[in-house]
């Protein structure tokens, strides 16, 4: 699907290969598909999809020790982020003004938590749309209705389903999809990808 050799960073090359191997393993585990049973192609906006007796979209993300995959019969985006200290200089440069204000009202662990919730939701949305970082992160606002995130563009609510994925307390992971679809989410620890299927 990707030209893995094009990545200069050996770690990125390795993780990309592991991620694509994970997709093939899941296609077999979930639907019994062997590699000759399907074609992986790049759709509009550079988003990968599987064409077989059915069509399924998928998306990958990796951070720290985890690679996560989301599958859906409609377009989908997923992002995982290992929590660290909030980078307020990044927020001030890239986030929506309302998000920056919310972050500035917090400190310590609460600020760190919200920063990575924002970041993961935003990344999952950009991966859902396929626009990547060509669309500015400040061009839309994330608001949390309780723990459920919503996305507003020019004060208009986007009709999407955005859900938190409970992967690990040290990570934030969100998936973004059409409201009619509940994606399948599959997290893997990187070392586990070297284990054979049971």
Model segments located where?
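Core catalytic alpha/beta fold that binds nucleotide/phospho-ligands
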Residues: 1-198
């Amino acid at each position: 699907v990707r030209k893995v050799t094009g990545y200069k960073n050996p770690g990125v090359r390795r993780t990309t290969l592991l991620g694509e191997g994970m997709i093939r393993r899941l296609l077999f585990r979930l639907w019994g598909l062997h590699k000759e049973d399907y074609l992986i192609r790049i759709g509009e906006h550079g988003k990968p999809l599987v064409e077989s007796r059915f069509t399924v979209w998928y998306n990958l993300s990796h951070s720290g020790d985890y690679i996560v995959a989301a599958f859906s019969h409609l377009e989908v985006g997923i992002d995982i982020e290992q929590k660290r200290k909030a980078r307020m200089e990044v927020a001030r440069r890239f986030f929506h003004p309302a998000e920056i204000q919310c972050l500035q009202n917090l400190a310590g662990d609460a600020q760190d938590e919200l920063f990575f919730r924002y970041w993961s939701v935003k990344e999952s949305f950009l991966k859902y749309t396929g626009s990547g970082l060509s669309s500015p992160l400040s061009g839309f606002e994330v608001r949390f209705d309780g723990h459920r995130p919503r996305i507003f563009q020019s004060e208009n609510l986007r009709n999407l389903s955005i859900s938190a994925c409970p992967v690990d307390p040290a990570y934030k992971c969100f998936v973004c999809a059409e409201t009619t679809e509940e994606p399948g989410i599959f997290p893997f620890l990187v070392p586990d990808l070297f284990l054979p299927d049971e």
